[in-house]
Amino acid sequence: MFAKATRSFLREVDAEGDLIAVSNLNDSDKSQLLSLVTKKKRFWCWQRPKYQFLSVTLGDVLTEAQCLSPVVVESDFVKYEGKFENHVSGTIETALGKVKLNFGDKGLRESQSSFGTLRKQEVDLQQLIRDSVERTINLKNPVLQQMLESKNEVLCILTQKIVTTQKCVISEHIQTEEKCGGMVGIKTKTVQVSVTKDENIIKDASVALEIPAPTTIAYSVIELYVKLDGQFEFCLLRGKHGGFEHQRRSDIVFPDAGALQDFPFWDVPDAGQGLPTPDGPLSVLKQGTRLLEKNFFPFVELPEQHRTALNTVLQAVLSDEELLAVLEQVCDDLVHSLSPPLAMLGELKPPHRQDLTAFLRLVGYRVQGGCPCLEDGVGSQKLFSTAYFLVSALAEMPDNAAALLGTCCKLQIIPALCHLLHAMSHDGVCDLEDPALAPLKDTERFGVAQRLFASADINLERVQSSVKAVTPLKDPSVLPLILYISLKGLCALGREH
């Protein structure tokens, strides 16, 4: 809930992606200026890097005894005023300029964070650079030794953070919209953040979380490039990446490339940078179509009972964002040969634990004593790799998009949406008279499809007897690709022999 609120807030005020949302309150306490942070390079291009706070600061790992005393500059960052009603509007004034808030979609009230007045604390970089001249990092420090063993992490320092100045309450509301065509409703969770005044009580909230002040809700880091002798450089320019001198790109250890290297786009280092699309954003989908057909074949060749069971468990995962996040974390740890801690499984609610255990069993893992163990055989490896490929895409979908995908499954329009993207012409137009697109002639079904595509930065509109998809030509994101992978995977699971 806290992570969803901070992510939602940054989407409104930080279009360039310079800030990183704090994902939990424990990390908020650890986010001190000059703290060391590890940036974990992910496997797929659409996966956002993961950041983890270390228990030391930059000064703690320098060889010289003289400690660093950073000069801290503090200023106002955001002042937001707005109301949470059925129809909400407002304007945020930030250090990045004014951002207009737009709310729409019948029956769905978008989550909007109102953290009150926020302050920005940042290190004087020029002074820090001067203080760090001729200083070196002790590479024998135990914390750094563990980083060097992993070989796919970058050392960063925290140089800026955004903190609250007032006590806030984050409340979560579960909404079920009207049924679509009398068949199925869309169940979504919305998160509201409001400043508490005079001990106001949040009513009609499923869950409420009180956040004290000051709490860090976002931060930014600078990567370090560390040489063999411990000398280091601050990577201040865009495009300049950190790391350790002995780690070349070809030396970085990625998990079981033999099982995963057949998938498209696997060797892109970071998410969020967009994809090179000289012929338009949708052209990337065309390029990967045949590979995706091949990559999801392990789903198609499963026995019907096995495939149905896996599809059923995945439907339960789609309806719960927290469970999806845990499943993605477990798969990620397994791929990197890290056994998921028993506490992670033990902390889950019994139904969630059952769903996660069932999913792992169905994709080739035995769970013994809380620790998953891969079954022998190439088939099990390919099946798990395929499942990880799909889960990693689903986990990167925007808020409530997974729930919309689940609704599309229940409405049985996933095959039509896959065909729509596959059959589109170069300019994004598709003939609605195509028999495979017949389900989309229904107005309510098409409305659900529009909302799903809109979450992936694709504007879907019906023009007479055709459907047109439009994506931003400027700064295209990876979201259309994530959507297409998600649709293809779900289609393969739901396909009849």
Curated annotation (Swiss-Prot):
GO molecular function: cardiolipin binding; phosphatidylinositol-4,5-bisphosphate binding
Record cross-link Glycyl lysine isopeptide (Lys-Gly) (interchain with G-Cter in ubiquitin), residues: K120, K189
UniProt modification remark: Cleavage at Asp-270 by CASP3 (mature and uncleaved precursor forms) or granzyme B (GZMB) relieves autoinhibition and is sufficient to initiate pyroptosis.
One Pfam family here: Gasdermin
UniProt entry tagged with the keyword Membrane: yes
InterPro entries associated with the record: Gasdermin_pore, Gasdermin_PUB, GSDME
GO annotation (BP), single: pyroptotic inflammatory response
Keywords, alphabetical: Cell membrane, Cytoplasm, Isopeptide bond, Lipoprotein, Membrane, Necrosis, Palmitate, Transmembrane, Transmembrane beta strand, Ubl conjugation
Residue(s) carrying S-(2-succinyl)cysteine: C45, C156, C168, C180, C235, C371, C409, C418, C491
Domain of life: Eukaryota
UniProt region (Membrane targeting domain), positions on chain: 1-56
GO CC, any one term: membrane
Family: Belongs to the gasdermin family.
PANTHER family on file: GASDERMIN-E (PTHR15207:SF1), NONSYNDROMIC HEARING IMPAIRMENT PROTEIN (PTHR15207)
Swiss-Prot/TrEMBL domain comment: Intramolecular interactions between N- and C-terminal domains may be important for autoinhibition in the absence of activation signal. The intrinsic pyroptosis-inducing activity is carried by the N-terminal domain, that is released upon cleavage by CASP3 or granzyme B (GZMB).
Record protein name field: Gasdermin-E
High-level lineage: Eukaryota, Metazoa, Chordata, Craniata, Vertebrata
Gene: GSDME
